[in-house]
Amino acid sequence: MNQRIDDAYKNCDGISRRGFLQIGALSGLGLSFTDYLRGTAQAKPANKTNCILIWTRGGTSHHDTFDPKPDAPVSVRGEFNAIDTAIPGGQFTEIVPNFAKHADKFALLRGWNPRNGSHGTADQWVMSGRRFNAAVAYPTYGSVVSYFHGFQSALPPFIQLNDHVDRRFGGGTSGILGLEHNPFVIDADANADNFSVRDITPPEGVTFERVDRRRNALAKIDALQRRADLQQDALKAQDEYYEAAMNMITAPETKKAFDIESEEDATRDAYGRHRFGQSCLLARRLVESGVQFVTVTDGGWDTHQNNFKSLKDSRLPPLDQAIPQLIIDLEERGLLESTLVVWLTDFGRTPKINSASGRDHWASTGFAMMAGAGVPAGHVLGATDAEGGYVSKDEYFSEDIATTIYQKLGMPSDLIAHGPEGRPGQLIEGKP
């Protein structure tokens, strides 16, 4: 199971002083000693393309965002009007005005057929691109990147911001690849005044100079142990593991990546002074610092009740502000061509509005969004019928989305991963 970095700790600073310098300092990665050795042994040159994946847990309504049906009966079209977008002839709903304004900066997939309407299995299927199979836990995208490219800097190759993933069936996890490729989960509010990352932030009173002194003391103890222990290879490997932990804790790029307060106020304001907005800003900073795959998660999208009020008042405004700004910011910094931005969700919502002013799970249609990394912007792919219930043109599946993601990340089309027992697993089944 993935070990969250904000799980049980020994004091209010986050971790015990003694535990801070133990090999367990990498526990936030879900690593054991042998796990680490496997991960470093498999490290390969990094691809030049990184990825930021937005995951909205619960199933975001396509009707009320990017696939409005203004001519449908009121029981289908809902409460929101359709507005024009930057794409000639394209329309979104009025509660995503910023997306509409910048629709020429991303590609919208309206022809997605999720073929599933259940939570949990959705997290596994959509975030891996492989149909749910109870016998095989297919890895999520970031875990595959970790598996094939490994550590390329002091920071982990795969980081997840916020903890809105249903892991009952292995969704969002490394699955068959082993715990060492699970995401490094940061479930701390990036918008908080005291934002810090546990397990890589020294407890109060422990300076980095003090860390170095402790490291030198431990090195002397280790030297004595070596004289009495003939397992030199194991000790050397342990040194490498320990050094990786120390590098992550003490490396300047680690502190710089998470120092979100160093951003100009105007930049932070542009993303939005809310948890989701600052998480997107932090994702950009992590990519700049060498993290190859960042997943930003958000919850509360299972709108069986009060769908319209929830979307308008709380759920959509932060995303409507932050995601277009993320794309713009990456572009202005020259990072968009080397960074794929993807927005995925469980599935769509029912065309017909229920008695609780909500929409239920819908397994036949939904949406996805992509930008950057050479994705043709300003295009709408696929279409749905008059009520948004079924794909009427250019149908795409989660397997096809996975193929596109892996293609942009430079993965081979015949991508095979081997589990801990050596069993091969094919990871790509769709078309780009």
Language-model region placement:
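Ligand-binding pockets and gating/stacking loops
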Residues: 1-432
